[in-house]
Amino acid sequence: MDLSALYYPYSHTLPAVYAQTHKLVAYNSIYNAFELYWLCVLPLLVLGVPLCLSCLPVRLSLPAKLGEKPLAASSRPEWDPTWVVPKHIAAIMDGNRRYGRTRYGLPLKGHQDGSQRVVDFMNWCVGAGVQILTVYAFSTENWGRAQAEVDALMNIFTSFMHDIIPQALERNIRVCVLVSDGAKFPSHIGSAIEKIETATAHCTAFTLNICASYGSRNEMVHTVQAIAAKVAAGTLAVDAIDEAVVSEHLLTKNVPDPDLLIRTSGECRLSNFLLYQIAYSELIFLDKMWPELNYDDFLHMMRTFNLRKRRFGK
């Protein structure tokens, strides 16, 4: 019996069935792989990228801000000749004690370093074309500190005024000491103040104002008293009192109001400093302690000042 006829359909159709089945399996594998990608791989990518980015250090994704460590040489700011230079800068030199305590274990050493930074900062101002620098050296509230600390601060203050006279005369810098309450000053402090002011009175290139035993509220009280005395004496009419008259009775009567006020140490308050004079000053608060400031920080201040839009209420 010829069995080839029986096997003929089988021998030809079976490979075709296998081939068709193979194609279906391949198609199903591709589909399953694509489906697996959408269900598993893609969510991992979507979630993984933000998670990876979140692990990067913040300072890699944010611009450097004032108060951080000195920038790398390639990122350091440079002086821009198109910048507008503030004529008058006021500085609250905060953080000396904390700096001295942290670095040396001696708060007083921080004040000594801080006095040197005044000279550095003044030199940066002179080089930039700033005309006036007013620094907050000792407030009326500082008299409430421990007597030993007050005595040490008075000694540093006296030494500073004595040591800076030669440099001030050489560079034509006038030094003025603004005192709103001098009753507690020892006599030798008063003599040192008179000496430095007299010695530099003729200097005109730059003015350094040192606020010592100063408080803005105390200054305003004396201003009101002086104006009231003139009204009582008949030399000043009440209707004639205006902002100009008030300014003429302030300790800063001979200088324009500050264009820029800075404060170091991360504190964001004015601490009874030039409250009347800074009505339209630009304010910059820095995280660094006063003795830590460097020239890069100064350039950052100038750049920040020039990014501000000073409208004076208009």
Q: What residues fall within each predicted segment?
A:
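Flexible, compositionally biased loop and terminal segments
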Residues: 2-314
